[in-house]
């Protein structure tokens, strides 16, 4: 599925041309999913679906819930990119992932994150290493 728009969620520090950039927000963890989903809804005239949701670090654990919120709003998710992630707990949302998941490991990743990449591979997710900005742009450009 071709990607319509990239959404950079709070905590991301990457530059992707044409992305919906919500990275400047810093909602508390207990309100993270709701606030980000509302911000995406508020900006819905600025982007096209399906979305490529980019989550970084501990925020990556919110991916299943943010994806569910987008489906509830009738917005298609074309993929997830988790950068140096804390991986989501299996079964947090029963039908997640509903789109391809790519894990990006940066040069700043610590040993715990690198070992978590093994868990991502075991789940059948693509794992890439390198510069997140260029990798995200490349993923978004896939047909």
For every predicted segment, state its role.
Residues 1-2, 44-48, 74-75, 95-98:
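Flexible, charged surface loops at secondary-structure boundaries
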Residues 50-54, 78-81:
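Residue in the alpha/beta-hydrolase core beta-strand immediately N-terminal to the catalytic nucleophile
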Residues 1-6, 77, 97, 139-143:
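Flexible, membrane-associating and regulatory peripheral segments of lipid-active enzymes
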Residues 2-49, 125-130:
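Active-site catalytic motif of lipid deacylating hydrolases and related acyltransferases
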Residues 7-10, 54, 83, 104-106:
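Short hydrophobic segments within beta-strands
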Residues 52-68:
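Gly/Ala-rich beta-loop-alpha elbow adjacent to hydrolase catalytic centers
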Residues 84-140:
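The feature captures the conserved acid-bearing segment of alpha/beta-hydrolase catalytic domains
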Residues 73-87:
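A conserved short beta-strand
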